Amino acid sequence: MDQDALISKEDSEVEREASGGRESLSDVIGFLDAVLSSEPTDIGGDRSWLHNTINTLQRPGSTHRVKGEGEGEVSTSSTQDNRSGEESRVSGGTSEPEAEAHARNVDKQNIHWATGRGASTDSVPQDLGNGRDSGILEDPPNEGGYPRSGAEDENREMAANPDKRGEDQAEGLPEEIRRSAPLPDEREGRADNNGRGVEPGSPHSARVTGVLVIPSPELEEAVLQRNKRRPANSGSRSLTPVVVPSTRSPPPDHDNSTRSPPRKPPTTQDEHTNPRNTPAVRIKDRRPPTGTRSAPDRPTDGYPTHPSPETDATKKGHRREHIIYERDGYIVNESWCNPVCSRIRVVPRRELCVCKACPKICKLCRDGI
């Protein structure tokens, strides 16, 4: 019999808990509907009704209405503490101290919700109807000792004197833009950005200053000469060094317009230039290679030129000829200076110079050897 009573009691408690859960869910849905359907509260209106203390305990599924001055009824729900209500039902009933504690919890939650909406815990601590912004905090103490910027000081001044902004608007003065840097002027932007146009987003770097210089006529001439003397093929290199004029700036009292262009070095007959403006190459010796002669100097008797004698081309206009042969069991090496104007035969012989220039240079020719 006791077991049947215990089972029936447990079943009734389970049913009450299930019904309590359904009621709490319906209460939450009803509270959300009431909040969404209510009109937004005017900033200048009286919201002292938010601070009324709730002294009566309500059922978990019931709702109470609080009516303020000049406002409609706002439906709120007492499901903020469903857990404590369910625990009180399970324990078997509610006592008077528990009811008072529940009322205090609901009161604290309502006060916290009102504080989050911009109100304080006092009855009416601030005048919300005079047009001032209650969200602006007072001037906090400068604990770190850091200097404050001018924009912050202006913002605090405008917050302390809200009538100043209204006076500026009434007089037609433009309202200053707070917390923003002034836009750069178009001409200043071009000068600061080194000719890159108006780009307020790219600040001017002081490290770039002084890199660009005004080209002088000397620099222009040097660039032109370098471009002209640059070889067409990368494989061919210049044999003569390129002389670059000094790039030092002229004195301030000197006029660049009267400066004469740099003089070119005098060309000689031994220098030849090709049509592609390649550097001039000096020919050291015009003498043909060994064993070859020009057409007029070749012998008319039909003898071929001598291919064996070695020559010494150390001096212009002369050949050092020598022959090696065997005589009486000895190796004989004979050498002599033969001028360019002489003919080379199979059997070399000493000939006199007929160009009248060799004796002035060669001692052997001058002595008549």
From Swiss-Prot:
Plays an essential role in the inhibition of host immune response. Prevents the establishment of cellular antiviral state by blocking interferon-alpha/beta (IFN-alpha/beta) production and signaling pathway. Interacts with host IFIH1/MDA5 and DHX58/LGP2 to inhibit the transduction pathway involved in the activation of IFN-beta promoter, thus protecting the virus against cell antiviral state. Also interacts with and inhibits host IRF3. Blocks the type I interferon signaling pathway by disrupting the RIG-I signaling pathway. Keywords: Host cytoplasm, Host-virus interaction, Inhibition of host innate immune response by virus, Inhibition of host IRF3 by virus, Inhibition of host MDA5 by virus, Inhibition of host RLR pathway by virus, Interferon antiviral system evasion, Metal-binding, Phosphoprotein, Viral immunoevasion, Zinc. The lineage of its organism: Viruses, Riboviria, Orthornavirae, Negarnaviricota, Haploviricotina. One of its GO terms (biological process) is symbiont-mediated suppression of host cytoplasmic pattern recognition receptor signaling pathway via inhibition of MDA-5 activity. The C-terminal zinc-binding domain is involved in binding to IFIH1/MDA5. This domain is also involved in viral pathogenesis. One of its GO terms (molecular function) is metal ion binding. This is Protein V. It is found in: Host cytoplasm. Zn(2+) 1 binds at H318, C337, C362, C365. Interacts with host IFIH1/MDA5 and DHX58/LGP2. Interacts with host IRF3. Interacts with host RIGI regulatory protein (via CARDs domain) and host TRIM25 (via SPRY domain); these interactions prevent TRIM25-mediated ubiquitination of RIG-I and disrupts downstream RIG-I signaling. Belongs to the paramyxoviruses V protein family. Gene3D superfamilies: 4.10.80.340. The keyword RNA-binding does not apply. It comes from Sendai virus (strain Ohita) (SeV). It comes from the Viruses.
